[in-house]
From Swiss-Prot:
Classification via NCBIfam families: lgt (TIGR00544)
Organism: Paramagnetospirillum magneticum (strain ATCC 700264 / AMB-1) (Magnetospirillum magneticum)
Compartments reported by the entry: Cell inner membrane
EC number: 2.5.1.145
The protein, known as: Phosphatidylglycerol--prolipoprotein diacylglyceryl transferase
Amino acid sequence: MTFALAYPHIDPIALQIGPIAIRWYALAYIAGLMLGWRYVKFLVARPPNAMTELEVDDFLVWATMGVVLGGRLGYVLFYKPLYYLENPLEIPMVWQGGMSFHGGALGVIVGIIAFSRFRGRNLFQVGDVICCAVPIGLFFGRIANFVNGELFGRVAPDVDWAMVFPGGGPLPRHPSQLYEAGLEGAVLFLVLFGLWRLTGIRHRAGALSGVFLAGYGLARIASEFFRQPDAHLGFLWGGATMGQLLSIPQVLVGLALLAWALRRGAKAA
Protein backbone atom coordinates (compact mmCIF):
# COMPACT_ATOMS: atom_id res chain seq x y z
CA MET A 1 0.00 0.00 0.00
CA THR A 2 1.34 3.45 -0.91
CA PHE A 3 -1.58 5.71 -0.01
CA ALA A 4 -4.79 5.81 2.04
CA LEU A 5 -7.28 8.59 2.61
CA ALA A 6 -7.48 9.97 6.11
CA TYR A 7 -10.64 9.02 7.98
CA PRO A 8 -12.22 12.31 9.18
CA HIS A 9 -12.80 11.13 12.80
CA ILE A 10 -16.09 12.98 13.28
CA ASP A 11 -17.41 13.01 16.84
CA PRO A 12 -20.48 10.69 16.86
CA ILE A 13 -22.15 13.16 19.26
CA ALA A 14 -23.47 16.07 17.22
CA LEU A 15 -24.63 18.16 20.18
CA GLN A 16 -24.19 17.88 23.95
CA ILE A 17 -26.59 19.75 26.23
CA GLY A 18 -25.67 18.92 29.81
CA PRO A 19 -26.26 15.20 30.30
CA ILE A 20 -28.22 14.96 27.03
CA ALA A 21 -26.20 13.79 24.03
CA ILE A 22 -27.68 14.08 20.54
CA ARG A 23 -25.91 11.68 18.19
CA TRP A 24 -25.51 11.91 14.43
CA TYR A 25 -27.09 8.47 14.24
CA ALA A 26 -30.31 9.79 15.78
CA LEU A 27 -30.23 12.88 13.56
CA ALA A 28 -29.85 10.63 10.51
CA TYR A 29 -33.04 8.76 11.42
CA ILE A 30 -34.87 12.02 12.04
CA ALA A 31 -33.65 13.53 8.75
CA GLY A 32 -34.63 10.40 6.83
CA LEU A 33 -38.12 10.32 8.34
CA MET A 34 -38.73 14.06 7.92
CA LEU A 35 -37.49 14.31 4.33
CA GLY A 36 -39.23 11.06 3.44
CA TRP A 37 -42.46 12.46 4.94
CA ARG A 38 -42.20 15.60 2.79
CA TYR A 39 -41.41 13.56 -0.31
CA VAL A 40 -44.39 11.24 0.21
CA LYS A 41 -46.62 14.32 0.51
CA PHE A 42 -45.30 15.43 -2.87
CA LEU A 43 -46.06 12.03 -4.40
CA VAL A 44 -49.58 11.58 -3.01
CA ALA A 45 -50.63 15.00 -4.32
CA ARG A 46 -50.47 13.46 -7.81
CA PRO A 47 -52.33 10.52 -9.37
CA PRO A 48 -53.00 7.81 -8.36
CA ASN A 49 -53.33 9.70 -5.03
CA ALA A 50 -52.52 6.75 -2.78
CA MET A 51 -53.66 8.70 0.30
CA THR A 52 -54.33 12.23 1.48
CA GLU A 53 -51.65 14.53 2.87
CA LEU A 54 -53.28 14.31 6.30
CA GLU A 55 -53.06 10.53 6.13
CA VAL A 56 -49.34 10.88 5.38
CA ASP A 57 -48.99 12.67 8.73
CA ASP A 58 -50.76 9.75 10.40
CA PHE A 59 -48.62 7.17 8.62
CA LEU A 60 -45.42 8.85 9.84
CA VAL A 61 -46.21 7.51 13.31
CA TRP A 62 -46.75 4.00 11.95
CA ALA A 63 -43.53 4.20 9.93
CA THR A 64 -41.46 5.42 12.88
CA MET A 65 -42.68 2.58 15.07
CA GLY A 66 -42.08 0.05 12.30
CA VAL A 67 -38.54 1.26 11.59
CA VAL A 68 -37.42 1.42 15.22
CA LEU A 69 -39.13 -1.72 16.54
CA GLY A 70 -38.58 -3.80 13.42
CA GLY A 71 -35.01 -2.60 12.93
CA ARG A 72 -34.03 -3.37 16.50
CA LEU A 73 -35.80 -6.74 16.73
CA GLY A 74 -34.40 -7.70 13.34
CA TYR A 75 -30.87 -7.03 14.56
CA VAL A 76 -31.51 -8.99 17.74
CA LEU A 77 -32.95 -12.01 15.90
CA PHE A 78 -30.82 -12.04 12.74
CA TYR A 79 -27.42 -11.00 14.05
CA LYS A 80 -27.04 -11.54 17.82
CA PRO A 81 -29.80 -13.82 19.12
CA LEU A 82 -27.60 -15.66 21.65
CA TYR A 83 -26.09 -12.45 23.03
CA TYR A 84 -29.46 -10.82 23.64
CA LEU A 85 -30.88 -14.05 25.02
CA GLU A 86 -28.27 -13.70 27.76
CA ASN A 87 -28.66 -9.89 27.99
CA PRO A 88 -32.38 -9.19 27.37
CA LEU A 89 -32.30 -5.85 29.21
CA GLU A 90 -30.05 -4.47 26.45
CA ILE A 91 -32.63 -5.08 23.70
CA PRO A 92 -34.31 -1.65 24.12
CA MET A 93 -30.94 0.17 24.19
CA VAL A 94 -31.06 1.34 20.58
CA TRP A 95 -28.68 4.23 21.35
CA GLN A 96 -25.90 1.65 21.65
CA GLY A 97 -26.31 0.85 17.95
CA GLY A 98 -27.51 -2.30 16.26
CA MET A 99 -30.32 -1.89 13.73
CA SER A 100 -31.20 -4.19 10.84
CA PHE A 101 -32.55 -2.87 7.55
CA HIS A 102 -34.35 -6.13 6.82
CA GLY A 103 -36.01 -6.03 10.24
CA GLY A 104 -36.95 -2.37 9.75
CA ALA A 105 -38.37 -3.21 6.32
CA LEU A 106 -40.55 -5.94 7.81
CA GLY A 107 -41.69 -3.50 10.48
CA VAL A 108 -42.67 -0.90 7.87
CA ILE A 109 -44.45 -3.57 5.77
CA VAL A 110 -46.52 -4.53 8.81
CA GLY A 111 -47.25 -0.83 9.33
CA ILE A 112 -48.32 -0.40 5.69
CA ILE A 113 -50.65 -3.41 5.89
CA ALA A 114 -52.22 -2.25 9.16
CA PHE A 115 -52.53 1.37 7.99
CA SER A 116 -54.07 0.40 4.64
CA ARG A 117 -56.67 -1.84 6.27
CA PHE A 118 -57.48 0.75 8.92
CA ARG A 119 -57.82 3.58 6.38
CA GLY A 120 -59.40 1.51 3.60
CA ARG A 121 -56.59 2.34 1.19
CA ASN A 122 -55.06 0.26 -1.60
CA LEU A 123 -52.22 -1.66 0.03
CA PHE A 124 -49.96 -1.64 -3.01
CA GLN A 125 -50.50 2.02 -3.90
CA VAL A 126 -49.56 3.00 -0.35
CA GLY A 127 -46.57 0.66 -0.50
CA ASP A 128 -45.40 2.21 -3.77
CA VAL A 129 -45.17 5.78 -2.46
CA ILE A 130 -43.55 4.66 0.78
CA CYS A 131 -40.96 2.59 -1.09
CA CYS A 132 -40.09 5.61 -3.24
CA ALA A 133 -39.14 7.50 -0.08
CA VAL A 134 -37.24 4.77 1.78
CA PRO A 135 -33.92 5.35 -0.07
CA ILE A 136 -33.79 8.82 1.51
CA GLY A 137 -33.59 7.26 4.95
CA LEU A 138 -31.13 4.64 3.74
CA PHE A 139 -28.81 7.34 2.43
CA PHE A 140 -28.69 9.23 5.72
CA GLY A 141 -28.42 6.02 7.71
CA ARG A 142 -25.33 4.90 5.80
CA ILE A 143 -23.75 8.34 6.17
CA ALA A 144 -24.32 8.00 9.92
CA ASN A 145 -22.60 4.59 9.81
CA PHE A 146 -19.62 6.29 8.19
CA VAL A 147 -19.55 9.06 10.81
CA ASN A 148 -19.61 6.42 13.55
CA GLY A 149 -16.78 4.50 11.87
CA GLU A 150 -18.88 1.32 11.91
CA LEU A 151 -19.81 -1.27 9.28
CA PHE A 152 -16.58 -0.50 7.43
CA GLY A 153 -15.35 -2.43 4.43
CA ARG A 154 -12.89 -5.21 3.79
CA VAL A 155 -9.14 -4.66 3.64
CA ALA A 156 -8.20 -2.90 0.37
CA PRO A 157 -4.45 -2.14 0.29
CA ASP A 158 -4.43 -1.35 -3.43
CA VAL A 159 -7.41 1.04 -3.50
CA ASP A 160 -6.42 4.72 -3.46
CA TRP A 161 -9.58 5.85 -1.64
CA ALA A 162 -9.33 3.23 1.12
CA MET A 163 -9.33 4.45 4.72
CA VAL A 164 -7.97 3.30 8.06
CA PHE A 165 -11.01 3.13 10.33
CA PRO A 166 -10.85 3.29 14.12
CA GLY A 167 -11.57 -0.20 15.35
CA GLY A 168 -10.70 -1.66 11.96
CA GLY A 169 -7.03 -2.32 12.57
CA PRO A 170 -4.02 -0.67 10.90
CA LEU A 171 -4.85 -1.65 7.31
CA PRO A 172 -6.86 0.56 4.93
CA ARG A 173 -10.36 -0.61 4.10
CA HIS A 174 -13.11 0.11 1.60
CA PRO A 175 -15.41 2.95 2.81
CA SER A 176 -18.29 0.57 2.13
CA GLN A 177 -20.76 2.75 4.04
CA LEU A 178 -20.37 5.35 1.27
CA TYR A 179 -20.80 2.69 -1.42
CA GLU A 180 -24.06 1.68 0.25
CA ALA A 181 -25.18 5.29 0.62
CA GLY A 182 -24.67 5.68 -3.12
CA LEU A 183 -26.23 2.40 -4.28
CA GLU A 184 -29.01 1.84 -1.73
CA GLY A 185 -29.69 5.54 -1.28
CA ALA A 186 -28.94 7.90 -4.16
CA VAL A 187 -29.06 5.50 -7.13
CA LEU A 188 -32.16 3.62 -5.95
CA PHE A 189 -33.92 6.93 -5.22
CA LEU A 190 -33.23 8.21 -8.74
CA VAL A 191 -34.33 4.93 -10.35
CA LEU A 192 -37.63 4.93 -8.45
CA PHE A 193 -38.25 8.62 -9.12
CA GLY A 194 -37.58 8.11 -12.83
CA LEU A 195 -40.02 5.18 -12.95
CA TRP A 196 -42.61 7.06 -10.89
CA ARG A 197 -42.62 9.79 -13.55
CA LEU A 198 -43.79 7.18 -16.07
CA THR A 199 -47.57 7.18 -15.74
CA GLY A 200 -47.83 3.64 -17.04
CA ILE A 201 -45.64 2.40 -14.19
CA ARG A 202 -46.94 4.35 -11.22
CA HIS A 203 -50.55 3.41 -12.01
CA ARG A 204 -49.67 -0.28 -11.84
CA ALA A 205 -50.05 -0.79 -8.10
CA GLY A 206 -47.18 -2.81 -6.67
CA ALA A 207 -44.71 -2.21 -9.52
CA LEU A 208 -42.62 0.38 -7.69
CA SER A 209 -42.66 -1.70 -4.51
CA GLY A 210 -41.32 -4.62 -6.51
CA VAL A 211 -38.59 -2.48 -8.05
CA PHE A 212 -37.58 -1.22 -4.62
CA LEU A 213 -37.43 -4.68 -3.04
CA ALA A 214 -35.43 -6.15 -5.91
CA GLY A 215 -33.29 -3.04 -6.35
CA TYR A 216 -32.33 -2.79 -2.70
CA GLY A 217 -31.62 -6.50 -2.53
CA LEU A 218 -29.29 -6.35 -5.54
CA ALA A 219 -27.56 -3.21 -4.24
CA ARG A 220 -27.04 -4.83 -0.83
CA ILE A 221 -25.73 -8.07 -2.33
CA ALA A 222 -23.24 -6.10 -4.45
CA SER A 223 -22.06 -3.82 -1.64
CA GLU A 224 -21.59 -6.76 0.74
CA PHE A 225 -18.69 -7.93 -1.43
CA PHE A 226 -16.81 -4.85 -0.17
CA ARG A 227 -18.16 -4.75 3.40
CA GLN A 228 -16.48 -6.54 6.29
CA PRO A 229 -18.80 -9.28 7.60
CA ASP A 230 -19.98 -9.02 11.19
CA ALA A 231 -17.17 -10.38 13.38
CA HIS A 232 -19.46 -12.72 15.34
CA LEU A 233 -20.96 -14.18 12.14
CA GLY A 234 -18.24 -14.06 9.51
CA PHE A 235 -18.92 -15.74 6.19
CA LEU A 236 -21.80 -18.19 6.08
CA TRP A 237 -23.02 -20.62 3.41
CA GLY A 238 -20.92 -20.56 0.27
CA GLY A 239 -18.94 -17.58 1.51
CA ALA A 240 -22.05 -15.38 1.60
CA THR A 241 -22.69 -12.87 4.37
CA MET A 242 -25.84 -12.60 6.45
CA GLY A 243 -26.79 -9.42 4.57
CA GLN A 244 -26.57 -11.28 1.25
CA LEU A 245 -28.55 -14.27 2.49
CA LEU A 246 -31.33 -12.00 3.77
CA SER A 247 -31.34 -10.05 0.49
CA ILE A 248 -31.71 -13.02 -1.87
CA PRO A 249 -35.36 -13.79 -0.92
CA GLN A 250 -36.06 -10.05 -0.99
CA VAL A 251 -34.90 -9.88 -4.63
CA LEU A 252 -37.09 -12.87 -5.54
CA VAL A 253 -40.16 -11.39 -3.81
CA GLY A 254 -39.52 -8.04 -5.50
CA LEU A 255 -39.25 -9.57 -8.98
CA ALA A 256 -42.39 -11.64 -8.40
CA LEU A 257 -44.31 -8.56 -7.21
CA LEU A 258 -43.11 -6.53 -10.20
CA ALA A 259 -44.13 -9.27 -12.64
CA TRP A 260 -47.54 -9.58 -10.97
CA ALA A 261 -48.13 -5.81 -11.08
CA LEU A 262 -47.17 -5.54 -14.74
CA ARG A 263 -49.41 -8.47 -15.71
CA ARG A 264 -52.30 -7.17 -13.66
CA GLY A 265 -52.18 -3.84 -15.42
CA ALA A 266 -53.30 -0.44 -14.24
CA LYS A 267 -55.93 -0.60 -11.54
CA ALA A 268 -59.02 1.47 -12.20
CA ALA A 269 -59.18 4.61 -10.13
